[in-house]
Structure formats: structure tokens, C-alpha cells
Swiss-Prot record:
This is Wax ester synthase/diacylglycerol acyltransferase 1. Residues 1-185 are cytoplasmic. Keywords: Acyltransferase, Cell membrane, Endoplasmic reticulum, Membrane, Stress response, Transferase, Transmembrane, Transmembrane helix. It is an enzyme of class 2 (transferase). The gene is WSD1. In the N-terminal section; belongs to the long-chain O-acyltransferase family. It comes from Arabidopsis thaliana. One of its GO terms (molecular function) is long-chain-alcohol O-fatty-acyltransferase activity. Its EC number is 2.3.1.20, 2.3.1.75. It is found in: Cell membrane; Endoplasmic reticulum membrane. It holds the Pfam family WS_DGAT_cat.
């Protein structure tokens, strides 16, 4: 009781800020993002300390901790605190010469971090520096950040604002180019605007109804990917694979699609291969089983207009205001995991489904429901809503576009960027992050449900190779014609 009164007095005299609706839903100590930076040089601890002191701690969320405000129904709030950057940078004392398999060690080390709840008594981030050479990098920085601080796109933008171009060490990284509307878009709107609004309205009603059915009772079919949210225990394993961005672009250009369509199609094909291997019986029997499965993913959708890297840099350098944090919606994406003779069918199905999601307002309605629930029913109701969504679907999926040119992070040239968000009750979280000519497939799996995450990762890589070969066959056929 005394502790509560002391905390009340502290909150009354300290500038506080409430959590955003999505941050409320992601406020559990077990919800965080683990990002791995592979560097081309050895890590310099002093460079990280100086760099963070000059940038990240000036971002409000990185210099605040989460506290319970007993004046407002026990809701969590952000409270600014003084901190020592050294306390958030961890350099483990390791005998690197005795480590026989560095790649496996890093995988185990990252997974171990993923299984430790966040220390909520201090600002919710930490850096682990490993001066260990692996097959992909000379050293690594593993960053653990609580998900309430920001979503994947926000954190990527903020980290880019701390980075500089390799070609020009004093220059900020350029924003990734946004898709421009055609010059005649206004005329197009005038011509088909009425029909388009009918489509938007109808599609939104249908997709929103499916969302609410999922919240209420509609669950995925029990399958080898689906965890058991009721047991409350998850043992995380984090693995990744690096694929060629050029291979993805080849498929994208040939099929006239978006990168996200290709990645979703590849995911569907990989999941189909993996699920097929988990069922006994002949090929025909397995095909029948896969046809009956309902497998869906909660796909994160960025709702924020493009934030300029310069604005984020100014926020950290000058303390200026910049909208930043968790501003994402979620759509329920039905995954096509049936056996297909034509591997390109997985890409076509992904595009058709995503096109339907794009013209619906499902993601905005999702965010609106969270905001409404928080205002009228409180944070506990928001957490319960999130548990229903994540507990009734099989996996989470997101894709974060990284820089197109090589950059350095606190004077360390980057070789690759990997990252996984560990949220919700799903046993499988799939995330893609691009960097220059690479795309990293990141899987965070609950090993109590999925015991062979590397097999699943390999199935996704193999699926991409099969789709690429089929695409090259399409190119050859078009050339012949």
C-alpha cells in the first residue's frame, strides 16, 4: 500500500504520457522485438555508447520506463527517467576460441534472449555486442526492444536515422521510395470513383465480419503450426535464412506483382511443403488433409504515412516532435496451403487475397476497435481482444523494407539485418527484412509446438527456388511465343 502511494506521488510530479492503443495491447513483458545486426568489422563498445548517447536516448520512449498509474485505473504510462547507457549495453564474457560452431552459438544466444521477459523496472531496450566471426559477419549486435516502444517499421526508421551511408559517411540514409500514383489518378477517380466506393464498402463489410467472427469464435483448424494459447508457456527459438532479393524481384517483375505478394506466396508454398511432411499417408491422402485445413495469419499493416528520416534525426538531435510508435493495424489473411502442381499458383493466390485486403478498411477498423475498447473498457479488455485474435489464428506475418544502399550503424558497416517480433499466442511468427540485395527470412517459433524450425525455414527457401524455376520457365515460354 505504501509503495502504491509513493508511486502515486512520483507520477503526480513527473511528466507522464499514456500508452497508445496498440502499445497497450503489446504491453506484456513477453512482447518484444529482437533485431540482429551483422557487421563487416569488429564491434567497438565505445562507439555504441557515444552513438546511443547522441541519438537513441533523445527519443522519448528510449529514455522512459513503463509504470502503472494507480490514479487512472491502474493503466500503464510512460515516465521519463535518467539512465546510464552503459547499463543497457551488454558484452558477454566469452571464450570465443572455444566456440566450435559460431553460427549455432549465435542462434542459441539469440533464442536465449528471446526467452527472458523484459525487465520492466528500467527503459525497455538493451544491446548485446558479440565480437564473434560467423559465416555472415565479423561481429554482431543483438538488440532487444519492447514492442510497446514501436512497431517494426517505426524501429527500422529510427535505426536508419542513426545510420549513415557508406558512400557518404556524413549523409543520412534516404527514405525508401514510395509508390507514386499515376499522373492521371484524379481522372481515374472521377471515372470509376463510384464503383470503387461500392467495392470498398462491400469488401470492408465482408472482411470486417470475418474479423469479428474470429474474435468471437472462429478458430483455425488444429494443425502442426498452431500452438495452445491456454497453457501459457512458450519456449522460443529464433532462426533465419538469407535469400537473394534479385530472385524475388525476378519473380515480381515476371508475374507483375509486388514484393509482398511474392513473399506471401513463397510463405504459402513453404508452409504447404512443411505441413505435407507432418501428415502420414499417401500423397493423395495428404492432399485431402491439406484441402480441409483452415490456416490463417495475422498480417501487420502499417497505417502511418511515410516518416522522413530527417524528421526522426531532428527528434533525436534537437528534441523536436515527430509522430512515432505503434501505429499498425492487422488483417486476417487466409493462407493457401493446399498441394498445387503449379507452384506459381501460390503467388497468384497471395496476390488475389492481398488485393482484396488492400481495398478493404479492415486494418483501420482493427485499430479503431482497439482505440474504442481502450477508451471505454480499459487496457485489460484490449489485452483480451489481442489474445482472441492471436489465439484463433496460426501465425503472425510482417514484411519490413530496409535500405537499398549499404549503411553503417554507429560507424559499423552492416552486412545484414535480421529480426523477429515475439508477440501473441501463436507458435509461429514470420518476418521478412530486406537490406540492399538480401532478404532475411526470420522465424520465431514455439518449440513446444514446432520442434524443427530449421526444417520449416529450409522448406521456405526451397519453395522460393521452385517458384523461381517455374518463373524462368514462364519467361522462356513467352520468349518462344
Amino acid at each position: 500500500m505504501k509503495a502504491e502511494k509513493v508511486m502515486e506521488r512520483e507520477i503526480e510530479t513527473t511528466p507522464i504520457e499514456p500508452l497508445s492503443p496498440m502499445s497497450h495491447m503489446l504491453s506484456s513483458p513477453n512482447f518484444f522485438i529482437v533485431i540482429t545486426f551483422g557487421f563487416k568489422t569488429r564491434c567497438n563498445r565505445s562507439a555504441f555508447v557515444d552513438g546511443i548517447n547522441n541519438t537513441l536516448i533523445n527519443a522519448p520512449r528510449f529514455s522512459s520506463k513503463m509504470e502503472i498509474n494507480y490514479k487512472k485505473k491502474g493503466e500503464p504510462v510512460w515516465i521519463p527517467v535518467k539512465l546510464r547507457v552503459d547499463d543497457h549495453i551488454i558484452v558477454p564474457d566469452l571464450e570465443y576460441s572455444n566456440i566450435q560452431n559460431p553460427d549455432q552459438f549465435v542462434e542459441d544466444y539469440t533464442s536465449n534472449i528471446a526467452n527472458i521477459p523484459m525487465d520492466m523496472s528500467k527503459p525497455l531496450w538493451e544491446f548485446h555486442l558479440l565480437n564473434m566471426k560467423t559465416s555472415k559477419a565479423e561481429s554482431l549486435a543483438i538488440v532487444k526492444i519492447h514492442h510497446s516502444i514501436g512497431d517494426g517499421m517505426s524501429l527500422m526508421s529510427l535505426l536508419l536515422a542513426c545510420s549513415r551511408k557508406i558512400s557518404d559517411p556524413d549523409a543520412l540514409v534516404s527514405n525508401t521510395t514510395a509508390t507514386k500514383k499515376p499522373a492521371d489518378s484524379m481522372a481515374w477517380w472521377l471515372f470509376v470513383g463510384f464503383w470503387f466506393m461500392i467495392r470498398v464498402t462491400f469488401t470492408t463489410i465482408v472482411e470486417f465480419s470475418k474479423l469479428m467472427l474470429t474474435v468471437c469464435f472462429l478458430e483455425d483448424t488444429k494443425n502442426p503450426l498452431m500452438g495452445n494459447p491456454s497453457d501459457g508457456f512458450q519456449s522460443w527459438k529464433v532462426v533465419h535464412r538469407i535469400i537473394s532479393f534479385e530472385d524475388v524481384k525476378l519473380i515480381k517483375d515476371t508475374m507483375n506483382m509486388k514484393v509482398n505478394d511474392v513473399l506471401l506466396g513463397m510463405t504459402q508454398a513453404g508452409l504447404s511443403r512443411y505441413l505435407s511432411s507432418k501428415y502420414d499417408g499417401s500423397t493423395a491422402e495428404k492432399k485431402k488433409i491439406l484441402e480441409k485445413l483452415r490456416v490463417r495469419g495475422a498480417v501487420a499493416i502499417n497505417l502511418r504515412p511515410a516518416t522522413k528520416i530527417e524528421d526522426l534525426a531532428d527528434m533525436m538531435a534537437k528534441g523536436s516532435k515527430c509522430r512515432w510508435g505503434n501505429f499498425i493495424g492487422t488483417v486476417i489473411f487466409p493462407l493457401w496451403v493446399k498441394s498445387e502442381k503449379d507452384p506459381l499458383e501460390y503467388i497468384r493466390r497471395a496476390k488475389a487475397t492481398m488485393d482484396r485486403k488492400k481495398i478493404s478498411l479492415e486494418a483501420f477498423f482493427f485499430y479503431g476497435i482497439i482505440k474504442f475498447t481502450l477508451k471505454f473498457f480499459g487496457g485489460k479488455a484490449v489485452e483480451a481482444f489481442g489474445k482472441r485474435i492471436f489465439g484463433h489464428t496460426s501465425l503472425a506475418f510482417s514484411n519490413v523494407k530496409g535500405p537499398d544502399e549499404e549503411i553503417s550503424f554507429f560507424h559499423h558497416p552492416i552486412s545484414y539485418i535480421a529480426g523477429s517480433a515475439l508477440v501473441g499466442a501463436q507458435a509461429l511468427n514470420i518476418h521478412f527484412i530486406s537490406y540492399v540485395d538480401k532478404i532475411v527470412i526470420n522465424l520465431a517459433v514455439d518449440t513446444t509446438t514446432i520442434q524443427d524450425p530449421n526444417r520449416l525455414c529450409d522448406d521456405m527457401v526451397e519453395a522460393l527456388e521452385i517458384i523461381k524455376s517455374a518463373t524462368q520457365g514462364e519467361i522462356f515460354h513467352k520468349t518462344e511465343v
